[in-house]
């Protein structure tokens, strides 16, 4: 969430910056609420001061042998008024906080201003798409012909947007995840982390999935008097980032770099009719997540680093891609700046997103109360959090199948993956 003080003191500037991402801040309503908050705050403080002063006079009156019943009654009356004002103030603050929790992050000044994905800006391109001398097939036809992708039985078992993988295609999928983990842990300095796949509501609030995006989650256990509800993770960003929730990290420990390979679960509530065939958009998919917990002074460089780490996977697999910086109107709810990496898919004759790398700055940290202790003044301050896909395994599988297809329907195994495939060089 945004800094409440900044939101109050710079309301017009905040509204202007949020408007660039298509979010209309109700300035009039917030102004009225803030005026009411100030009035209640002053009234509460005045009542508290009056009660304290009169309470102090009780002892003095008793020392003089005077009757204190009227003073005691006055203190009781002030106490009741004070309790009422405190309750009213608490309710108002909860209302303001609820609004603040629904406000997206401020875009970084370096993010291009735009309305939607058409205004995203390409920053670099790597590799040249292969020119095939035969008619290319998509991953669905190739995978089904190899008996490696089974959509029919997945629908029978679970419904649409699920997949069963078998044989060498399943092995290739597993190899991709292992390859990514090994690269990030041995070359890029991330610590491999095993995380829960079920998380509580506080964790989802911390990273910003709640309250705004609850419909995209699979809720497995409702909240009860005995405890919070549990939901399947939409991304390992949630448990990895929440690792530092309610913590004060020593500045010398920064940056903290964590990675995890997990299944991810999304209802895709807003994706009706999009990518209904194939492995591009599933309810359950594997992803290697990269998370960095960084010093505020270094988080923009960390964003460049995390993006390059995701790009390295595609370079080693020799898969052509382009990197886009998202415009303000296309960024995610909690992001201040985002790079999307798009891989070339020959069957679609276009680039498709395979990774999204974002700097959340202190947006998540404020929700989580994740802080570091500064060496300069020994005081706690909010951390910056970053995350990125390194990569989405299923989409990488699609890219490998399509880019490495042969005329006879076989798939050449990329050299970087052969050690993970027992030396196998050809599928089919």
UniProtKB/Swiss-Prot annotation:
Family: Belongs to the class-II aminoacyl-tRNA synthetase family. Type-1 seryl-tRNA synthetase subfamily.
Pathway the protein contributes to: Aminoacyl-tRNA biosynthesis; selenocysteinyl-tRNA(Sec) biosynthesis; L-seryl-tRNA(Sec) from L-serine and tRNA(Sec): step 1/1
Residues annotated as binding L-serine: 235-237, 289, 389
Domain remark text: Consists of two distinct domains, a catalytic core and a N-terminal extension that is involved in tRNA binding.
Gene Ontology biological process terms, A to Z: selenocysteine biosynthetic process; seryl-tRNA aminoacylation
Protein name per UniProt: Serine--tRNA ligase
Function (record text): Catalyzes the attachment of serine to tRNA(Ser). Is also able to aminoacylate tRNA(Sec) with serine, to form the misacylated tRNA L-seryl-tRNA(Sec), which will be further converted into selenocysteinyl-tRNA(Sec).
Pfam families: Seryl_tRNA_N, tRNA-synt_2b
Record's catalysed reaction(s): tRNA(Ser) + L-serine + ATP = L-seryl-tRNA(Ser) + AMP + diphosphate + H(+); tRNA(Sec) + L-serine + ATP = L-seryl-tRNA(Sec) + AMP + diphosphate + H(+)
Encoding gene (name): serS
Gene Ontology CC annotation, any one: cytoplasm
The protein's assembly and partners: Homodimer. The tRNA molecule binds across the dimer.
Record localization: Cytoplasm
One annotated GO molecular function: ATP binding
Originating species: Shewanella frigidimarina (strain NCIMB 400)
Binding-site list for ATP: 266-268, 353-356
Record keywords, A-Z: Aminoacyl-tRNA synthetase, ATP-binding, Cytoplasm, Ligase, Nucleotide-binding, Protein biosynthesis
Lineage: Bacteria, Pseudomonadati, Pseudomonadota, Gammaproteobacteria, Alteromonadales
Taxonomic superkingdom: Bacteria
EC identifiers of the protein: 6.1.1.11
Primary location: cytoplasm
Gene3D superfamilies xrefs: Bira Bifunctional Protein, Domain 2, Serine-tRNA synthetase, tRNA binding domain
